[in-house]
């Protein structure tokens, strides 16, 4: 005798698996999860206990009655009366509430053909007892099907079914029954009548019949054809058996009288095929993936990762991807099964499917930073470290000049256009103590760079020009510093100028909640001059004092943890990265991983290009030896082995690759309709190459913002390093693609190949020049702006009707001029009546080209004669202008 899973019992009763597990445990059964199995006797006891709330006596007697059940199961047709003794009550109890009189169960489709023939007459007599528990007397038959079907999990479903489905006189439709055997579509139509009766009767039995009606009906249709060779089973455990026990009788009352033996043979053969694995082999041949074994179990709570695709979400819910896609479509989102779902979409879907969702972090397996933090969280070997200072502010306010004076260098003079376009990290020694400075660009395009600088710093110095006051990037710098939660020091620069006004700076910053200490605030304002050096020593003293208050500490003996500030590709060195060490010490020969890049450090360099043996906490330097260019802002961690570093990097790379492949293609229905109506969105395909990763990131972000409803920039490829032949080939394959280079120059060979391929290469060393040129190109692709220019106006004084010519308006010009062939609009009482062209223009009897203000004329309007006195004729022309972003 085979066992039955708790999940199947829960499905048939319509209860959550968790409740059924609890009920089974109350009965003393050793079950813990929904996947545990129990014997048929125990399952029947659970059925009775759930339906009545009373523990069955037979179960209390340690299964003394199950034997009686086993015997009747063996003799299905000859001994129906015996089975009615005790098995009757248990299956029936599930259905008693819904069916006061078992005799009305004519349309019950859940009986086996042969069982229903003999049983119906005897059972009605035994149902004399008034008690609800005695009505189940009819249920014994289901147990017979249980005996036959016990080899598979659904056998238990039959326990709750009736067997008095004999009442209908099926003889009239024998011919239809025969047709049904050969024609599946006809067979389906025969189900309708009995299914309707069944539906009415089943309403009350809702909990007991939770089985998927749709699936079972469709599969029973296939059974009617008796051609099992073509059946493709989605799950051998779930599909066929429950359908035989629930749907066989209803559709074929004629079949019972005409072909009982054939039906019995078919059922037995099908059941036997399960054990032999025949159907399973057939399913493999059809390449049909089996559904989840838990398919019939209602999912109420699931754990899903932060990043999950549509088909993965469907699998978690035991649903088809098409169901999830359909729900999203109804919400106005066009998705494919490989698209990622964001948290909002997950919450909406969870509500739609009535499930509780618990979002978990799926990046733990390659989250080397979390693993590192776990190792050092109780670190006690802490020592003071050098402070990291970030200099921020508006473009051209003197940030780099300040750092140049401190370092005694001339970095600003070497920057293109006199503006910083890279993040630089420098070391300065003051009073025997090291201070690390990060110089960030002030141009608006470098927002991400400034945010990155603020994120790794201990103190922020915001430089404001005394003669210029607070500017947009000044406000942005304040926002970044506040978001990072770091102390702020204000340096009022250019105090050597006559137009310097420090109060202007203080007033502007006070509006941003940055109050100076002399005004009762908590922020230090230091007047300086990067040109003369005035106040710079005071600034450094305040920096060191602030660092002491912060008590900055790190463990120099731990594995290194650093942040990548900038990265690039250098000839002779390969991928290099500028880093700032936050904890631990980085040595030459250490194995490190930074995102998708990993490797063993071949050399360390300081900001002057000199070799180093190690970089301590709070210090900066350049590392050489990574496998590829590390992304700016990535965290770099020292690991023990090359294998560990490679695994982290490869897992992260695979994750990123999969995410790229399934980039969301979501678009609202309204947007989709608009695109179809107005034509395809115009795009400018570009390839971007830059000298360092930070500049590349800034360029991409700036160009992607250059978009509107009509046009956008499509970055088809970007990378760090020079322009290569593959870049030219890619641009050639893409229509109208241009290559944009920043701080790089193509070689003669590349220029020649680009010329042959018809590819345009543009190079720049100032970022806003590049952006302005792209704006101009986009403007040329956009539809021109049509501007209307007024030419003149005339008042109709008299209407003249000329045979074979039409109506002529006798006018006097009140403004400007009226020209022949010009566009005009006829205005009556302030409302435009008609727009057209001047077909004829005469002064007295002469045709003229134009009539000036104050003169009378006759005006004929093309294809329009409804002219009245006191109408106004307004003349204008349309001027097309180039659109700009």
UniProtKB/Swiss-Prot annotation:
Membrane-crossing residue ranges in chain numbering: none
Ranges for region Disordered: 55-150, 269-300
Top-level taxon in the UniProt lineage: Bacteria
Annotated region described as G5, given as residue ranges: 529-531
Region (G2): 418-422
Region (G3): 439-442
Main location: cytoplasm
Binding site residues for GTP: 393-400, 439-443, 493-496
Domain tr-type G positions: 384-553
Matching PROSITE patterns: G_TR_2, IF2
Basic residues: bias regions: 281-290
Biased composition (Basic and acidic residues): 65-146
MF terms in GO: GTP binding; GTPase activity; translation initiation factor activity
UniProt cross-references to Pfam families, sorted A to Z: EF-G_D2, GTP_EFTU, IF-2, IF2_N
Region: G4, residue numbers: 493-496
Cell compartment(s), UniProt: Cytoplasm
One GO cellular component term noted in the UniProt record for this chain: cytosol
This protein's UniProt keywords: Cytoplasm, GTP-binding, Initiation factor, Nucleotide-binding, Protein biosynthesis
UniProt similarity note: Belongs to the TRAFAC class translation factor GTPase superfamily. Classic translation factor GTPase family. IF-2 subfamily.
Entry-linked HAMAP family: IF_2_B
Primary role: One of the essential components for the initiation of protein synthesis. Protects formylmethionyl-tRNA from spontaneous hydrolysis and promotes its binding to the 30S ribosomal subunits. Also involved in the hydrolysis of GTP during the formation of the 70S ribosomal complex.
Xref: NCBIfam families: IF-2, small_GTP
Protein name in the entry: Translation initiation factor IF-2
Organism: Campylobacter concisus (strain 13826)
